[in-house]
Every structure is written in C-alpha cells, then in structure tokens.
Design a protein with these regions (language model features):
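ATP-dependent carboxylate-amine ligase
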Residues: 56-64, 70-80, 84-222
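Acidic, Mg2+-coordinating active-site environments of NTP-dependent enzymes
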Residues: 1-93, 217
Length: 222
C-alpha cells in the first residue's frame, strides 16, 4: 500500500499537460498520450490534468492506451460542471452552475473560446471579487450579464474602480436568472456560446446549484 501511495504522489508531481497548437498531450515518465479534446466531454485544463493522472494510473495497471482512450471518449461527466446543454437557434449553451468562486468562472472563460455572453451572480457571501473583476476587465467576452445580489455588488465595484470598463456597455445588470437569460439570448450571436458560471452560491434563490442548473437548462432550451 505504501509503494502504491508513493507512486501516486510521483505521478501527481511529475505529470505534465502540454498544449501546443491544436493538440493537448499528457506526459509522464518518458511516455506521452494525446488527449482527443474534440472527442470528449470533459473540458478545461484542470480536467486534462486529471485525465493525465488517470492515464498514468492505467499504465501502472497495464491497461493499454487504446482501451483508456475508448473509455475516455464515452465518459459522461457530472452535470453542471461546464456541461454542454445543447444548441438552440444557433447558440451553444453551457451550464457551469457548480461555480461558486471566482477561480471556476475564470477557468470556464479560459476554456471556452467563443463565449459572447457570460451570466454571473447569486447569493452574496461577502467573498472578494477583485480577482474576477480584474480578469473580466481584460477578457474579450463581449457581454457580462450580472444578476442577483453579487451581480449588483460586482457592478458597483466595477463602476467605482473601473469606470472606463463600465462605460464600454459590456455590462448588463439584471435582477434574476430568467432576466439574464433573456438578455443573453438577444445578445449572443449564432455560432457562439452563452455560459452560465455564477461565481456565487445559489442558496436563498434556489435549493442548490443543481436546481439552478436545471432551471437554466429549461430556460435556454424551452
């Protein structure tokens, strides 16, 4: 058991995930495998790292790369985690309702390259949004649709600290998710994506993040 634990630590420390041009490759212990990003449902650099770890463990268990890749291509990730919901009227919709902190929203926007509108906001727990605001001020996403209590606070902080950003008309302040979806549907161009990644808790508005994601899915696909 100790030897296995030590090997797992080594895998974690030495795993590399390299993105070059249109390829993503996991490398460990002199071996490598190309991750077929376009053929899998797991999105994001953090998931690609986890895929690399799983692949290295499979090598330890003498599972062939072809078998690993076959399983990877059919793996269905858990819902509400940067989940592709489908396409309607040419707009692709992604549900990242599990996002309750700044970092996850930043990861989502770094992963999806064609987002026209991102929906942010929820219950206000008093967390610091300065990192997310700095990121958004330099990110090319055309429309940032803010909702609920944290959306209002983010809007006010941007207005005070980034007045030029606020004047760019990229910010849309709404009350609730339903209003935010209506704005997103008007603003998102066909062929582009609409992402809900709230960076906030759902409590007091929804039962949990799962319900928030389910409501979002119903609103965008109805």
């Amino acid at each position: 058991q100790g030897a296995v634990s030590e090997e797992m630590v080594n895998i974690w420390k030495k795993m590399e995930v390299i993105q070059e041009n249109d390829t993503t490759e996991a490398r460990y212990d002199g071996h490598s495998i190309e991750i077929p990003v376009s053929q899998i449902r797991l999105l994001g650099q953090h998931n690609y790292f986890d895929i690399g770890i799983a692949w290295a463990v499979c090598r330890l268990l003498n599972i062939r790369d072809e078998v690993f890749l076959e399983g990877l291509k059919t793996y269905e990730p858990l819902p509400h985690r940067l989940q592709f919901l489908g396409e309607k009227n040419g707009i692709k919709y992604y549900d990242d309702s599990i996002s309750t902190i700044c970092e996850t929203t930043i990861q989502a926007l770094n992963t999806l390259k064609d987002v026209d509108a991102v929906l942010i906001g929820g219950m206000d727990r008093g967390i610091d949004y300065s990192e997310l605001i700095r990121f958004l001020s330099g990110h090319p996403v055309p429309y940032i649709i803010l909702m609920e209590a944290t959306g209002k606070r983010i809007f006010e902080e941007i207005r005070q600290d980034y007045p030029d950003f606020q004047k760019m008309e990229r910010l849309i302040l709404t009350d609730h998710l339903e209003d935010a979806v209506k704005e997103a549907q008007k603003l998102t161009r066909p062929g582009h994506s609409c992402l809900m990644s709230p960076a906030a808790a759902s409590y007091g508005i929804f039962k949990n993040f799962e319900e928030r994601g389910e409501v979002f899915a119903r609103l965008v696909l109805k």
